[in-house]
Amino acid sequence: MNQEVMNLFNPVVQPQAFDQIQISIASPEKILSWSYGEIKKPETINYRTFKPERDGLFCARIFGPIKDYECLCGKYKRMKYKGVICEKCGVEVTLSRVRRERMGHISLAAPVAHIWFLKSLPSRIGLLLDMTLKDLERILYFESYIVLDPGLTPLKDRQLLNEEDYLKAQDEYGQDSFTALIGAEAIREILRNMDLPKIAEDLKVEIAESTTELKPKKLAKRLKIIEAFMHSGNKPEWMILTEVPVIPPDLRPLVPLDGGRFATSDLNDLYRRVINRNNRLKRLIELRAPDIIVRNEKRMLQEAVDALFDNGRRGRVITGANKRPLKSLADMLKGKQGRFRQNLLGKRVDYSGRSVIVVGPELKLHQCGLPKKMALELFKPFIYSRLDAKGFSATVKQAKKLVEKEKPEVWDILDEVIREHPVMLNRAPTLHRLGIQAFEPKLIEGKAIQLHPLVCAAFNADFDGDQMAVHVPLSLEAQLEARVLMMSTNNILHPANGQPIIVPSQDIVLGLYYVTLMRDGEPGQGMMFANMGEIEHALNAKAITLHTKIKGRAWTFDENGEKVSKIFDTTPGRLILGQLLPHHVKIPFDVVNKLMTKKEISNMIDIVYRNCGQKETVIFCDRIMALGFREAFKAGISFGKDDMVVPETKPRIIEETSALAKEYEQQYNDGLITQVEKYNKVVDAWGKCSVKLADEMMARISAVQKDDDGRDKPINSIYMMSHSGARGSPTQMKQLAAMRGLMAKPSGEIIETPIISNFKEGLTVLEYFNSTHGARKGLADTALKTANSGYLTRRLVDVAQDAIITIPDCHSENGIRMRAIIDAGQIVASLETRILGRTAAEDLREADGTIIVPAGEMIEEIHVGRINAAGIQEVKIRSVLTCEAKNGVCAKCYGRDLARGTPVNMGEAVGVIAAQSIGEPGTQLTMRTFHIGGAAQIADQSFIESNFEGTVKIRNRHVARNTDGDLMVMARNVAVVIDGPDGTELAVHRVQYGARLKVDEGDKIKRGQRIAEWDPYTRPILTEIDGTIGFEDLVEGASMTETIDEATGIAKRMVIDWRLNQRSASLKPAMVIKTADGKVGKLQRGGEARYMLPVDSIIGVDPGGSVKAGDVIARISMESAKTRDITGGLPRVAELFEARRPKDHAIIAEASGTVQFGRDYKNKTRISIVPHEDGAEPIEYLIPKGKHIYLQDGDVVEKGDYIVDGNPAPHDILAIKGVEELAAYLVNEIQEVYRLQGVSINDKHIEVIVRQMLQKVDIVDSGDTDFLPGEQVDQLEFEEANIQAVENGGKPATGTPVLLGITKASLQTRSFISAASFQETTRVLTEAAVNGKADTLEGLKENVIVGRLIPAGTGAAMAKLRRVAVQRDELILAQKAETSEAPLVPIPHLPAAE
């Protein structure tokens, strides 16, 4: 019978409308209410008849018929008997589909514990009973008895007795004098008799009275779980099962294979074991078997049920016939292949195809070429309906035949169907939302999809065999969204940074660069032209070339915005390009009247987009693409080996550096420098040599050479490619023609012998071997990093998925302060770029008080110039970090939607966009590590240069002139300030301890002048007073070694770890400076001139030698320069987002005060800070010995200063300096990693993620709320509870914000469905069930999982409309109820969703 007809009889069931999903523990009654019958036999199907056995695991009587509307014995067939139950075989006549829905159950002969509540840490049963897991297992697995009621015996309540003790006690006190049980029955009894409210009261009292640190935490955990049971309506004894539910048979199928064998789901095996053991146990109990046998059987039953629920969680993994572990119910949910990630979040779609891509340069930006064969297949249903409508076919079958035969009318109809019906193209891996875009298909012959060249950057596609998938949006809404939101013409800007992503690359760039070249001495130089027609004529007549310097007329705009034509000094090529520019006041001809490199082209597109809008930009892009391709093809640029020019000075430079390296080797041999210092210096010298050669080569290649007749020779082709940004980088050119340079080992260290040859000369065998090292590392890294980066993206998406724009404005007064980021004197991120597209939090005024941007307005391009001109150094802007929206984020705090250049829309999923923007370059970069073939880039800063002209002021001027006459920085907080002529601070540079200052107070300084320099490879310890050296506790062999370098015979003193030896563990190695009278000198700030020496410091002076203030008395060697490469970067980003404590983290002062050194404690140094405030307790720090402590006794520190160097732990920054400082730190650190690779990401994306990491509060004082001290609660719950408490006249709770890493934050979201689908599924579900959690379906993931539209974008609007509709319905119903008595009143019109 036709399925359509069948469906007529089945009433259409409306999908159940629900607002939330709750999860709790199933009670035995609940399990029985689900069940359609008890399963008594382990049999599955009769292997001869293939019919299910009665009462077996596939029983048709319990689960329903195998064929639609047919009972098992065949007595009742067909629809007319629907609902009849056959008296012979007991099967209900209905659809076989019910075998996917109906459940059964197994009644257990003895209760068993649910393994999730027992073994999933923390053990819920253990917490409730306050017993250890070990004791619980001994009871449950029948090793010990537990006393339930001691009666009058001296036994204790809940005492554990082993078999012997139990029998002995029975003999001693009589059998009925006390009650002791064993197994799950015992635990069930205890759980059933628990008086939860009373226990909770007792615990609260105990917590209030407890004095120790740890006890309340432990008690609070137990109290929390008891309250969870009280509130959720779960009963503790339900954690022990008496009935086991059996899932429907079609979800654990048994399929006959050929050859009489069967393929079966593992669950059937697991269920069979449970049934077998249960039946055996029943028999043994009936037969009154000996206790020991029954007990053994009960233990085996417990193990069987454990394996069914979660195989391998306890004891051995149960394996099938082929030694493969069986997949239990828990495994069905867990992991990438589990139900959540494989089926609920990773559904497959139909109406899709995939094929190889080829370039389609003649396409428009909104088009893609779709092979006819593919289109015919994808649009079949549309073609059938159109054929039917036009009368070509009467039935679907006929239409099918027509399409199969590919009749000519089919192609005409295909054309009609496809017109204006967008398709979506996707290239895997889809790292950000631009990996799927919509295009209008254009039918082409062949089998490859044609892709527009300009969208390649967004897809990260190239044409070396990449494949792409095509998807057809079917419904009208889907087509509409594809056209309005996903069309390639709507995605011109990059969501990560707001720069154009539809940017010409490679050939197009080369063509445009070639067109806009200007050369001296070309024919026709200096001619004048009135219009383009004349120029074209002259070009055709070869009177001029594209590059001739001419005077030509072009349209532009004057100051008043009037269109005028002016004469420019330009070239014909530039005029041709200028013709393509849209006419607009803000886009004068000067935009194109220069040499076009990739960057210039990008700026040009940006200017066009910002001023002329999207449509003009798209047309313009298509035009310049055509021009670029045409001119590149005409130019015929290619290169040969002579284009790679090796500088003549190469042998000389190499010789000089080799001599330097030999000299360092000699110095090492003479014992003047250590091995590490020698290595650093040699590497440094070769690095400089490499740079010098590269510069010489670049100078040679880029130099313009003249012919004999004064005409410019054509520019070097390689230089053109690299300079224009079309292909190749200076690094690659350096390797081709200068020298390959330093290489890195796989461990990341730099090999000190560089590769002197370049690729043109060819490498020697040894050099080749060294270079394979780096290259291989690159390839290995690529594979590993792709996985790491993907995992980072997954965690980011998970933590940020519920950050959605929910309200237009939260009216927050707060914000964060932004200023330019200056690193080593270079402006890395200017103030303009950081505040553009953000909302001002306070009025920005010019010097005379006129408002540039009022508070609450967006800072646009027009304002930025004025802010700059007004000399404003710091701007307070609104940020998502300080947004006060209850759920999600408000539009004002977020600012501009970077991908559109307009204020962000309601419902935009900014969290996911942020996650993609941060994650996408991670993968890109990891895939990009090996492009420079492992050639080492040494990143080490050793000086500060001034960026401004001005006057020098030195803050906290602790300096001294040493023996060499250098000004040495003697303190940690010295800063060099450069003041402008009007006294404004232009820049502040913190100068590190031990640096040599090149300027002093009041000096005038020029741009590019050095302010200070230091040795990047060592950290010095300086003396602050003049005197002679004395050693303290520097004992040869115990705390110091004097190594005589075997190569040189020169002694070198070094501090060694003195704690390794018991005898010397109490030493405190130090150097003292003695004055003339032989006493230890006094420092100005009090305290003695005693300098503690950390492990591995190298002593640079002899005892008794005289020193001057500012001299280096010892130095600590820094680690050798590691190559910096995002390889180090990606783990760093992950470390920051996971908020891990770095290995050797900095110790930060928690208060401002004076430093005191205390008594040493074991092998730690004790430092305390005495705060300046009166009555404040000193704060103690224990610092492992051998760490270099920045401070000396008596120093004054500010809150937040470093005591011990290192990367600070983000938690410390949050605790000491607050949220704004923490955000600034995380943003800067993460940005630094990306900047190093030249990736630009807008700060707001990182802020969104940090906001998600700061959603929890640690309760300090619970006030009159239900919270427990030390508990972590959601910010939202915290605020709501406080409002409630204040309303009831109570005291609000206080708390401190907690920083959670992204994994932890994802697992602690309000939605348990989202958390379960992320990681640790079992743990999340166990906890949610105990708490009876309800998921209100607010985020994106949970809605995808339950199969709804996501509450973002158009889905948000739908959700809003649905809410409004429900409110109206309620009003109407309420009125109807009233109107049975009263007359109708008009319904008030509720505001619809915008």
From Swiss-Prot:
Q: Which cofactor(s) are needed, names only?
A: Mg(2+); Zn(2+)
In which residues is Zn(2+) 1 bound? 71, 73, 86, 89
**Which residues of the sequence carry a binding annotation for Zn(2+) 2?**
810, 883, 890, 893
Q: Which GO terms describe its cellular component?
A: DNA-directed RNA polymerase complex
* Entry keyword annotation includes Cell inner membrane: no
Keywords on this record? Answer: DNA-directed RNA polymerase, Magnesium, Metal-binding, Nucleotidyltransferase, Transcription, Transferase, Zinc
Q: Name one GO molecular function term.
A: DNA-directed RNA polymerase activity
Assembly with partners or alone: The RNAP catalytic core consists of 2 alpha, 1 beta, 1 beta' and 1 omega subunit. When a sigma factor is associated with the core the holoenzyme is formed, which can initiate transcription.
Q: What is this protein called?
A: DNA-directed RNA polymerase subunit beta'
Species name: Beijerinckia indica subsp. indica (strain ATCC 9039 / DSM 1715 / NCIMB 8712)
The gene it comes from is rpoC
